[in-house]
Design a protein with these regions (language model features):
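Conserved structural-core and active-site-/substrate-pathway-adjacent residues in large, well-folded domains
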Residues: 12-15, 79, 199, 241, ...
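Amphipathic alpha-helical segments in well-structured domains
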Residues: 27-35, 196, 265-269
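Extended, Lys/Arg-enriched charged tracts that mediate electrostatic binding to polyanionic substrates
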Residues: 194-213
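A short, charged/proline- and glycine-enriched loop
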Residues: 232-235
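Surface-exposed, low-hydrophobicity interaction/linker segments
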Residues: 255-276
């Protein structure tokens, strides 16, 4: 994988890392909080990654002096696309609630009107079943999440191609139960991990498109003319059918059946993890 694409994926995965830091210390916006967290606490000095974290919102970009080919423009529009896909608005309430929990995606499925929420925790605490009780996402919990992320990222070399896999593991472990948005005007059932992963996926597609088309001025293409970009055929969606997979899993001999069942189930899980 090309170095520029690796940096887009890394920057996109980390672009909202300032949200846990900001919610734990509300003195700055989350873009600045994320930049300072990675630069000062974690020790990441790669400018191309840091720019994506600091300048992924319009109000930050328009007052910046970043280059026309900065990868920040890719993460900026990838974030907008991912946000458009995962934000479903409700009609009531305004403002933000920094203590908001992540809601279950099943709350509104099939016309449901439920209020199950996940306990604020990391994946190291085991299976987190949604509950109806209110447990606020305290400043202390956000601090623990930031400390865990910092400890893990400090031991990772961002110049190594394995960095992305390690980064995905860290984000999944610590941000799977952190809401991406704490706006009272949105349904908070998308985790920060899922949002960042979608942003990284979209960003990796965009850089492939730009390189294929020979486009080097990312500012003009993705920022100044962002509305026109949305109508371009920059993405290719594909699907695959694994119906009948049950036969593969369950058609096994009696001898060692439990071991075979577990291994085939694990194989399927890894296949989905790799493809999705």
């Amino acid at each position: 994988m090309q170095e520029s694409k690796l940096k887009v994926i890394a920057g996109a995965l980390l672009h909202d890392i300032g949200k846990p830091a900001y919610r734990g210390d509300k003195s700055k916006n989350h873009s600045i909080s994320g930049y300072e967290f990675l630069n000062d606490t974690v020790g990441i000095k790669d400018t191309e990654i840091l720019e994506q974290v600091k300048y992924h919102h319009k109000n930050m970009i328009q007052n910046s002096s970043i280059a026309d080919n900065s990868l920040a423009y890719i993460t900026y529009i990838a974030d907008n696309i991912a946000s458009g896909a995962d934000r479903r608005k409700v009609d009531e309430n305004q403002g933000f609630d920094m203590d908001m929990q992540l809601e279950s995606v099943f709350n509104i499925l099939n016309g449901n009107n439920q209020h199950y929420k996940y306990k604020p925790q990391t994946m190291e605490n085991g299976i987190n079943y949604p509950i109806e009780n209110e447990i606020s996402f305290s400043k202390e919990i956000y601090k623990k999440i930031c400390d865990d992320i910092a400890d893990c990222l400090k031991g990772i070399d961002e110049n190594n191609s394995e960095y992305i896999n390690s980064l995905l593991e860290v984000m999944e472990a610590d941000c799977s139960f952190v809401p991406s948005s704490t706006s009272k005007n949105e349904i908070a059932d998308i985790s920060l991990y899922d949002h960042c992963k979608i942003t990284a996926a979209v960003g990796s597609c965009i850089i492939d498109y730009l390189e294929q088309e020979g486009i080097t001025n990312y500012k003009d293409e993705l920022y100044n003319n962002s509305k026109q970009f949305y109508s371009k055929k920059a993405f290719l969606m594909y699907s695959f059918d694994i119906s009948g997979i049950q036969d593969f899993i369950y058609t096994i001999s009696a001898k060692g059946s439990l071991k075979l069942l577990r291994s085939r189930s694990f194989y399927l899980e890894m296949l989905c993890e790799h493809l999705i």
